[in-house]
Amino acid sequence: MSEYLFTSESVSEGHPDKVADQVSDAILDAILAQDPKARVAAETLVNTGLCVLAGEITTTAQVDYIKVARETIKRIGYNSSELGFDANGCAVGVYYDQQSPDIAQGVNEGEGIDLNQGAGDQGLMFGYACDETPTLMPFAIYYSHRLMQRQSELRKDGRLPWLRPDAKAQLTVVYDSETGKVKRIDTVVLSTQHDPAISQEELSKAVIEQIIKPVLPPELLTDETKYLINPTGRFVIGGPQGDCGLTGRKIIVDTYGGAAPHGGGAFSGKDPSKVDRSAAYACRYVAKNIVAAGLATQCQIQVSYAIGVAEPTSISIDTFGTGKISEEKLIALVCEHFDLRPKGIVQMLDLLRPIYGKSAAYGHFGREEPEFTWERTDKAASLKAAAGL
């Protein structure tokens, strides 16, 4: 019987790139709480002792950006100089400009050539869903995120007091080539920052027994499963001291772990007029509802936009041979049941709210948080009925 391997990774909230994402989205939320129509493109850089805030923001909100950045870094867990990054001691620089009026006229309703709210940029976005996990996400990325959430939980509640904020997980999964189903877990890689006093042996045992085994399905762990725990042997220096972190540098972790294509646009720090974010969320919503409706067991959708134009320039769907109806009919159903114009997406998913901070670590998809409207399957029944199934 033929098999193939597939791998995805996740990183913790203390990973430097994720620190940057969370600061950017915390600033976005602070602005949207006061000014839901604000235009925000908030970028963040973190390095040893330094946090740089830059980008374009047009808003009436009065926000203490430095305070928001420090509070976010502190909540993540970088609150002392011995960790190499201290929320209270690091320098924070603020370098925001306003949104270009040339861009604004294409996005503002009633301005520009298309009087509807146009897309904030050109670009292509993908959405994906499959039936491998309860939240209709690919197996490897779903469980990589769960491993990182478990690491954070045990760090914060003190059960493993030697854990530090920075960590990464990677899962290699064996699939059956004929059925496309997960057969077993081949390799688990987990690297976590730690207190220098803990031994590699003690750390490895605790990570396997208290982080990995409680999270992963036991029937998929075999005697052949390989565990690679802190394979360099030491991970004391981490976070922004170990590596410079930037907003938008973990786009595959944020989405489908490489199981679906990515259009290239990052999410964090961007208000919902940016289709990089809002249309990617809408695509996930569409794909998840198609799978939840039983119209396919695997669904990938691509949309594209032109700056200043409201209607998508293209919509395509691939169900990889699992569809109950043709892809042409699926596209027609999508056009009938989902408004994929920028303003339609914002209204459909209620996106003008301060809901983004929670999305900036552990994945934007596959988490059924009440704020994550794009994870609802409320269109599944109507799609199924319209398809005649």
From Swiss-Prot:
Keywords from the UniProt entry: ATP-binding, Cytoplasm, Magnesium, Metal-binding, Nucleotide-binding, One-carbon metabolism, Potassium, Transferase
Pfam families: S-AdoMet_synt_C (PF02773), S-AdoMet_synt_M (PF02772), S-AdoMet_synt_N (PF00438)
Class of enzymatic activity (EC top level): transferase
Residues at which Mg(2+) binds: 17
Main subcellular location of this protein, as a coarse class: cytoplasm
Involved pathway(s): Amino-acid biosynthesis; S-adenosyl-L-methionine biosynthesis; S-adenosyl-L-methionine from L-methionine: step 1/1
GO CC terms: cytoplasm
CDD domains: S-AdoMet_synt (cd18079)
Amino acids binding ATP: 15, 166-168, 234-235, 243, 249-250, 266, 270
Cofactor info, note text: Binds 2 divalent ions per subunit.
Subunit and partners: Homotetramer; dimer of dimers.
Function: Catalyzes the formation of S-adenosylmethionine (AdoMet) from methionine and ATP. The overall synthetic reaction is composed of two sequential steps, AdoMet formation and the subsequent tripolyphosphate hydrolysis which occurs prior to release of AdoMet from the enzyme.
Xref: NCBIfam families: metK
Protein name from the UniProt record: S-adenosylmethionine synthase
Gene name as annotated: metK
